[in-house]
């Protein structure tokens, strides 16, 4: 599969650099994208506009803007569902997706509402570019996470102060606030949420218990 990268040359204040050059999870965003897509894409093309994308070979193609942050769990879900569908798809999200409404939509324009879904700047084409492209709704898997306790009398109107952490992260970076969101909420905390979710499965608990027996260590000290 080839990937087509649409350049976003807007500079993010106060860094005065485009989003692709800013560091996310200790590496430039463009390198994070490349590492995430390496298992799926064999070639790449960079263009300034969607209309510049060559469409002569009719090959499997992934198109995205270079200011997007996404993780392995998200891209795996999107590509597997799009491939099983076998039709041109565009990343979309439900209107009631808490991760999108709470953390991804403010201060940006790349994820916007069209009809009864939010659509983003990532497309999948199984046989080259097509005019007809249907939205493919991806559930980010909101995982409620409270970082600290707020007194009841201060949060009785809107409930407890919590973050909605995605199990499948996607973000359009257009503001310095999004760098914090990508690194902390959608990065480190998202990885922790996936680990916590996996530990709740009985099979994983048994694996850890068995490993601790083999190593003759406490459960929290074993190598698993």
List PLM regions with ranges.
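Noncatalytic linker/hinge segments flanking ATPase motor cores
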Residues: 45, 101-111, 208-215
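Extended charged low-complexity segments that act as oligomerization/scaffolding linkers
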Residues: 50-52, 66, 97-99
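N-terminal glycine-rich phosphate-binding loop and ensuing alpha1 helix
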Residues: 1-55, 75-76, 80
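Left-handed beta-helix
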Residues: 5, 53-60, 68-70, 74-75, ...
